[in-house]
Amino acid sequence: MKDIAIFGFKDSSTGQLINMLDDKLRRKLNCIISINKIPKINIAEEHKKRPNKKNEFILNNKIYGLPVFQEKNFVKTLKERKIKKVFVFEDSGQQRSNIFKQLKKEKIKILSFIHSSVKLMGHNTIGKGVIIFPDCYLGYKSDIGDGVVIQSGCRIEHHNVIGNFCDLNPNLTTGGFTKIGNYCEINISVDIINRIRIGNFSRVGTGSLVLKNIKDKELHYGRPAKFVRKNK
């Protein structure tokens, strides 16, 4: 029975997730849903930029052989298509949070995906709807909140706490006893030393080295990371 939907349509995210699923799960995929406006793309022009045509785009309301639905009021579609389980891979943590609230009301199961190469060092707690890409390391007694996306090559050391609906981009390294708040975005190749606290809704720019705590709703960048501005 094809009773699984995926929220999110980008080849850089959803495409990778579908590619990582085993055959059994792929056969159960029903459709793609997005709460975001789907941009109009000149596919021929895009393929000229990359002649091997490896990037996939929505064509005739389909991608990866699955129908695509763009709608903020998605509950009706889920019911009509008899969807019982979903992966949620929309762009931002706030969007994922809003979708989670609706899905919980409808009692639709929110699925997690943890790649087989991920190393879990024990006594870990992992929330609902978490997606962890290949070659990540989750240290002893570290916890991950709901709706977190952890991209490839992240190393989260022991006794860390990652809040709900965070986006952790590739090759993040944290020291022990680090705490990252809810709705944070940590960009590519960031290093965070031991016992750092990063507040809710904060962002850290690419390649930064975090040596000091970061308050709520702040953007920090650099080596060492310094305050840039309040995060909108």
Model-predicted regions and their roles:
Residues 127, 144-145, 163, 181, ...:
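Parallel beta-helix/beta-solenoid
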Residues 1-84:
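A solvent-exposed beta-alpha-beta segment
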Residues 9, 34-37, 91, 115, ...:
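Cofactor-binding loop segments of dinucleotide-utilizing enzymes, especially the Rossmann-like FAD-
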Residues 152, 169-232:
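Glycine-rich hexapeptide-repeat left-handed beta-helix
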Residues 12-13, 94-95, 209:
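Short alpha-helical
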Residues 74-143, 147-148, 153:
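Extended, small-residue-rich solenoid/repeat segments and analogous flexible loops
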Residues 17-19, 98-102, 144, 216, ...:
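Short amphipathic alpha-helical segments
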